[in-house]
UniProtKB/Swiss-Prot annotation:
Gene: ZSWIM1
Key word Protein biosynthesis present: no
GO cellular component terms, semicolon-separated: nucleus
Assigned keywords, A-Z: Metal-binding, Zinc, Zinc-finger
InterPro entries, alphabetized: Zinc_finger_SWIM, Znf_SWIM, ZSWIM1-3_helical, ZSWIM1-3_RNaseH-like, ZSWIM1/3_C
Protein name (Swiss-Prot/TrEMBL): Zinc finger SWIM domain-containing protein 1
PROSITE patterns attached to this UniProt entry: ZF_SWIM
Superkingdom of this protein's organism: Eukaryota
GO molecular function: zinc ion binding
Species in which this protein is naturally found: Homo sapiens
Amino acid sequence: MLERLKAPWSAALQRKYFDLGIWTAPISPMALTMLNGLLIKDSSPPMLLHQVNKTAQLDTFNYQSCFMQSVFDHFPEILFIHRTYNPRGKVLYTFLVDGPRVQLEGHLARAVYFAIPAKEDTEGLAQMFQVFKKFNPAWERVCTILVDPHFLPLPILAMEFPTAEVLLSAFHICKFLQAKFYQLSLERPVERLLLTSLQSTMCSATAGNLRKLYTLLSNCIPPAKLPELHSHWLLNDRIWLAHRWRSRAESSHYFQSLEVTTHILSQFFGTTPSEKQGMASLFRYMQQNSADKANFNQGLCAQNNHAPSDTIPESPKLEQLVESHIQHSLNAICTGPAAQLCLGELAVVQKSTHLIGSGSEKMNIQILEDTHKVQPQPPASCSCYFNQAFHLPCRHILAMLSARRQVLQPDMLPAQWTAGCATSLDSILGSKWSETLDKHLAVTHLTEEVGQLLQHCTKEEFERRYSTLRELADSWIGPYEQVQL
């Protein structure tokens, strides 16, 4: 590893970066030892430019493996830039390829460059972009650069990439709005409505759907807070043209994949004050998940054959054995309908990638979606909708069992779902869809919701809501038939 580093770091290469105005001292043995754990194993030596201070902290860091350069050479048209801050305030810039031609699986398979600038000022960022361009002659083919809403150095991008168009990314706008919804401390039904509408719109970003979301924000957000959301972004058609080509399924997969990618970057770099340790942890993760290279080759073969690749790596035999035991325990312990619901959740677990972080009492389970809290102590519970609605083991609880090599136990679910204790539910859950029953359930649910709203309000608010409801009922069904409220 050390020899491979020394070879490419010649005097000629040092002069090349000196011509760029970048100071690079010869790499000392101590610095080489420090960086030894930072480099991804590759058949060819990677390109690395770094600068350390007296405390051995990384002042600047620019890294690209030959594999990453190869990915960029194939897909240079659209660059996606994501920033990750650590506790010291240092920022990791991750460059990823994007666009219709990119069909790569693997959470970091699209990453083509890592950089830590000395400072996020004009000089530091200009230097970072210049090194990226020096590493990648294909930079001239970059047509679009996608950034987050807080990305301020836009003039530097315009100067370094004069022919590229800089746009806000749909993913970063979505994350920005999600964070704002939580910060506003809205009523739970309103917050849930906004989050659901946002997710649906991002997966089908037509002009009509974006306009509906814009109107919904205008109606639900307090006027004084509305400017903070920059809802006018939803009406900027140029932003969404860069994303609209994806189908609903492709959009959902795209957002889920980026969600996990950014989570990985935050987990390894964003949680440690040492840039060196953060990058070492990130690169170790990439080494352990080196199947991304095979997926890259498969993606190229698929594109050359003009057919999408649907190759899915086989699960290890041990994992298959554990999941078969979980299936058996579900069938043995649960009622038929409950087992069917949980087996559907397990199917999602089997086809997904999960990140599991352990805590003292709770575990964070993420399956290519929002993070949920799992309470493993019986009866097991989770913060997701499935578990809250049915009180059954959800995909997150099943992922926890799979990771722990455990099976479902009777005390992990309520008694009403235990086999032999809920026969009255079989006819309902196993029945076919009925329009009459569907309407009845909808009316019942609506009646309960209205009743809850009328009960939990002041007398004045009750009178106002009741009179509004009375007017609606009379105008809809009356006036010849009195509606009993």
